[in-house]
Each structure stands twice: as C-alpha cells, then as structure tokens.
Amino acid sequence: MHKNLFDHVNTRPEAIHLPDGTNPDAADACAKYNDIIHSVGGIDLQLLGLGPNGHIGFNEPGEAFELETHCVDLTQETIEANKRFFDGNVDLVPKQAYTMGIKTIMQARKVLMVVNGTSKAEIVKKAFFGPVTPEVPASILQMHPDFTLVGDEEALSLI
C-alpha cells in the first residue's frame, strides 16, 4: 500500500491505517482495525477495483454482506491474479488475507471503483446490471447511495 499508493499521495502518516499483518491473532487484528474505522467516524472515500469473479477487497463470491474486517482464504483465481505482485511466482502469494468486509465498504460515504480492460467487461455487466447476490460481491454496490464506476471503453463495452 505504501509503495503503490501512500508514497504517491499527499497524506499524513498518522492518517494511514491498515490491518496489522504482524499480529498472530487474526481476529484481534481485524477487531482493532474495525475499532480504528469506527473511532475516526468511518470512511469518507472507499476506492475499489473489481476482481475477475466480482470480488471487492478480498470478499470472494459467497461471502456474507454483513461482515466487517475479517480474515479470508483466497481462491486460486485470486491467488493467480495477484502473482504479478510477487514477480509472477504464485508460490509467494499469501493464501489468506485480511479484508475490509462488505458491511464496512457499504458504510463508506462514497465508493469509487476503477475498472479497465476487456477482461473486466463481462463481470462489470454482471455486477451492475444483474441481480444483487453474494455470488457476485460487487453487485451490492448497486445499493450504495453514492457509488461511481469509472472505466475505460473496453471495460464498459457491454453496458
């Protein structure tokens, strides 16, 4: 997050909060992260991408919409998609991750999703013009009062 985002934006270090990946107790790390979010009054802007199976964050298909930050087992598809961050070596990709839950994402005041490429066209159509279902986690964003989808022509070609 620092290398790809925080080092490139004008933000105070004390305003940056991430789940503590060094905490051996996943439930405690997630609870503390949720406490931080609540203590600062929630999230103003949630920036999201869209996974090939409709996941947002690491909320994979089938995850309950009512969850806050929690630890998840990553699907093989998500592991494969993230190997690019590990020099292409799938064996180096973690098999679990902390993720902000759908409940917390939906409580953000504004949600912005950025999509690009033809590989996202079908899932964009399914997520935003299909039924709201846990099988396509991003579909819940149809219900958000202030959601914006930004994408290139290819990603938006089917809508």
Predicted regions and their residues:
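Short, flexible loop segments at the rims of nucleotide/cofactor-binding pockets, characterized by
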Residues: 23-25, 88-94, 127-129
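A glycine-rich beta-strand to alpha-helix segment
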Residues: 35-63
